[in-house]
Curated annotation (Swiss-Prot):
InterPro entries: DUF480, WH-like_DNA-bd_sf, WH_DNA-bd_sf. Belongs to the UPF0502 family. Pfam families: DUF480. This is UPF0502 protein PSPPH_2577. PANTHER family: UPF0502 PROTEIN YCEH (PTHR38768:SF1). Disulfide bonds: none annotated. It comes from the Bacteria.
Amino acid sequence: MSIESSSSESSPNADALHLNSSEVRVLGCLIEKQATNPETYPLTLNALVLACNQKTSRDPVMSLTPGQVGQSLRALEGRGLTRLVMGSRADRWEHRVDKAVELVPAQVILTGLLLLRGPQTVSELLTRSHRMHDFEDSEQLIHQLERLIARGLAMLAPRQSGQREDRYTHLLGDPDDLQELLAARQHAPERNAANPAASQRFDELEARVAALEERLARLE
């Protein structure tokens, strides 16, 4: 299945959102930190660089420079997806995805997770979203994913060889980058297929490590 032909409904918003990998990472981080660390949001450039380069809760792990992050912010600002907030001590950045693309909070959170971690199963999204949005159950989460798909902002990814569960991915990035991610996942082990409980514990521990990394970064 072609990524570009996956949506049954054309979305003018989606057509304008062909982001490069750095822009995808920056936008995903702003969405995540608004939900998990509202006391430090909007983010300074330095805080955003740290968020982009986290070793946990990121796939792939990246090493972006302040210059790359700043350039991505300005490009996103030009699309109406970010905004600079002037401050007395430091300038900060916030995302505008909810307004620019007209998404409800649940859809914003799911979009952020897909931007940060690529193709994911419903169970993975349910576990990883628990600190950011209270989905009642998997059916409610699937309903919001289907609304994103109808807008041309996400898709049900083709199931790869050896995978038992369907995966969803965003459609905001470059189609070639998304195809590359899907190809890489074809050779990756399906972690939660054999032991879902262990997979959930792993994701919870990963979230705790990410929170500790953020605290340490603020102390430095």
